[in-house]
Regions:
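N-terminal helical cap/lid subdomain that shapes the substrate entry/recognition surface
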Residues: 16-118
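Short intrinsically disordered, low-complexity coil segments enriched in acidic
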Residues: 1-3, 55-56
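Short, acidic loop-to-helix structural element flanking the phosphoryl-transfer center
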Residues: 105-132, 169
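Asp-based, Mg2+/Mn2+-dependent phosphohydrolase catalytic module
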Residues: 2-23, 96-98, 130-236
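Alpha-helical elements of Rossmann-like donor-binding domains used by nucleotide-donor carbohydrate transfer enzymes
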Residues: 39-43, 82-89, 122, 170, ...
Length: 236
């Protein structure tokens, strides 16, 4: 399936220029699904005034995005501590009745044990370009998940390394340096038109959003519906 907003000239540039592919850990490598994620959201519903699963999942995603976007390198804290801070701030608002430490354990379980994308193994096997992961959370989570699923990745880069989340360019610039590629030689597959895609763009990296459900039809960013369609457009 072709990217509708691409012309052939842009496709030719991608095919011949791309030397490295970067994937968002959350959303792309591990979609928000699976027993661990469902258990976390269900528990959140039972222990708060968030009325149902969809409402709670949306609240968590959007609130965490806001906290990350409002964070700067001057007041950066790790994702775990940011989530702790978020639930401490919002405890009364959502009438949270469970210990925040239990929330953190459940989030950690999501990051380590959630099922990976059904496409990922095939994507890694077929890609002729090296593939890297960029993550808001510590590298250990992605490393454990990859080992658990017997998958090889060329490297994982955490926002902790640069003390800035993915809405800033620093993590992408760091990833380029470590991967040994120029910005015009990299392609980033992201998850959020308000968080990581703007950061990648600031770093000068060609970026697309993996829009599996068609949620971003009005976005200014290029979209793909699957990782397999990306390989097709890269001539692989």
């Amino acid at each position: 399936m072709k990217w509708s907003c691409y012309n052939m000239a842009v496709l030719e540039v991608l095919i011949y220029m791309t030397k490295a592919i970067f994937l968002s850990y959350t959303g792309v490598v591990i979609p928000r699904r699976g027993n661990e994620y469902r258990q976390f959201i269900d528990t959140l519903v039972k222990n708060s005034n968030l009325r149902d699963y969809e409402h709670a999942a949306k609240w968590f995603t959007e609130t965490l995005r806001t906290y990350k976007c409002n964070s700067s390198s001057d007041d950066y804290v790790s994702e775990e501590n940011l989530i702790r801070q978020m639930f401490e701030d919002k405890r009364d608002e959502i009438r949270l009745s469970m210990p925040i430490e239990k929330v953190l354990v459940m989030v950690q379980n999501c990051l380590i044990y959630s099922p990976i994308s059904d496409e990922l193994a095939g994507f890694l096997a077929l890609s002729r370009r090296p593939v890297y992961i960029i993550s808001d959370c510590a590298c250990d989570y992605a490393t454990i998940e990859m080992k658990r699923n017997h998958l090889h990745i060329h490297g994982t880069f955490s926002c902790d390394s640069v003390q800035a989340y993915r809405n800033y360019p620093q993590i992408f610039e760091y990833a380029l340096q470590k991967a040994g590629v120029k910005k015009e030689e990299a392609l980033y597959i992201g998850e959020d038109a308000q968080l990581d895609l703007p950061g990648a763009r600031q770093a000068g990296i060609t970026s697309v959003i993996l829009d599996r459900r068609g949620d971003y039809q009005g976005t200014e960013f290029r979209r793909i519906r699957s990782l397999s369609s990306l390989l097709a457009n890269l001539g692989e």
